[in-house]
Swiss-Prot record:
The keyword Signal applies. Residues 1-30 form the signal peptide. This is Mannuronan C5-epimerase. Keywords: Alginate biosynthesis, Isomerase, Periplasm, Repeat, Signal. It is found in: Periplasm. PbH1 repeats lie at residues 229-256, 291-313, 315-338, 340-362, 364-386, 387-409. Catalyzes the epimerization of beta-D-mannuronate to alpha-L-guluronate during the synthesis of the linear polysaccharide alginate. In addition, is part of a periplasmic protein complex that protects alginate from degradation by AlgL by channeling the newly formed alginate polymer through a scaffold that transfers the alginate polymer through the periplasmic space to the outer membrane secretin AlgE. It comes from Pseudomonas fluorescens.
Amino acid sequence: MGACAMNPQALKGSAMLAAAMLLASGAAMADVAPQAKAPTIAKELQQAKTYTISSPPTAPLEMAKPALPALSGYTDAAMEKKIVRAKPGKISIRRMMQEDALKDFIGGDNKMAEWVVRQHGIPQAIFIDDGYMNLKDLLGKVPKQYLSETSPGVFLAKLPIVVGRKGILEIDKKTQELRLSQEAGSFLINDGQLFVRDTKVTGWSEKANGPALYKSPKEFRPFLLAWGGTETYISNTKMASFGYANSKSYGVSISQYTPNMAKVLKRPEPTGWIIDSEFSDMWYGFYCYETTGFVIKGNTYKDNIVYGIDPHDRSHGLIIADNTVYGTKKKHGIIISREVNDSFIFNNRSYDNKLSGLVLDRNSVNNFVADNEFYRNHTDGITLYESGDNLLWGNKVIANRRHGIRVRNSVNIKLYENTSMANGLTGLYGHIKDLTDTDRDIALDPFDAKVSLIVVGGELAGNGSGPLSIDSPLSVELYRVSMLAPTKSSGISFNGVLGDRQEEILDLLVRQQKAVLIDPVERQTELQD
């Protein structure tokens, strides 16, 4: 689709750009003129004098690229094998009160009023329990005022549909489209096993006789939520017009139960796969909370409202691969935030998003970000906030409006063989920031105002204000980094603490082809292993 058409162009453009800059920069790499220092950076110069420049051995920097997880097992055929159809399920219509899976939507703050108004009475839901049910089988078993076939294969649901703890619901190609009524307050809850394959599920406005298109954050729109202990599998499906600004109602959400309920229910973390599907006009394209091993592969997330893909709190072991994310209207294409650890983000394309292409945020550590393309995002290509011990390898970060790669308050960030080119500001920008006077909850999201980087290989070329700027680093190690001139200058210039020692650094890095270690004199702190 859009991505396929645009991707080769972006890469072709970057190759042409590189060739043009090689010609334009001429001997920029061999003959770098030190720039006159403006008086305004006196403080930086004073800091710079407290750093030593040395050439460490290169052997410890030579690292083989870690293996990425195989994706061949995550297929529709493998999904099909997981469906147990042996035991027919039971269907009932029950009141929404007293149901664990619905407590979050019924409890305090007069939450029940929403459903009373939409259903014109005591709120009810359709429940599938104790076995397998195909959505088409619900017809005839559920009164027509709650679920009807409006044209062949097109179903309109006017109540929430809940897959019970031992329930299995399959929505497949027998369903051309499932429409969840916005006016009647329909949504989909998985508390068991849910399979959505070869179909279409849409938040539907009966009034407009069309999708429940986004109008405002607080306006109810149908959504899908899977709770703790569940498995959710979606393949070759189009989902659109889900979600709004209300807890767990964001679009497609996979979430452990809330802490108080989780203590009582003791259900394991939820999991599942979403493959080869398309999500558009969602408040969040994907959200998860305390989720394990979830796979998001080969999907398109386009024109969603706040985020495309948003794994959150303490989710881990995720695979986010081969996705195309573009046109996110309010924030980032992909963001992992608050202790989302030990995950793989690779072979994705994220472009034309309102803020960054990818963000690693709030102490998300030990993640491997490889072989992605982040381009034409309206702020940074890749942003790391307060998230140390991450490895970025072989990413192409091109023509983003601000920095290519920005690293804030994050230590032991390893950047291998990345290309950061033609970005509006800096190719690679490392800095510290004191967040104590912000609205941040420091107990929930602690931070250290420290930054340290290892940069090996790759290319920093043609960025608007220079290849590299690092402010107050704990340490920086550079080796085999190719740098070409920024667009606004005849030669390379470093900003931040590197500026004062630029000639020394470039002599080692470019002319002598050695590694460079920039280390504060006062601490000489080693990078944490």
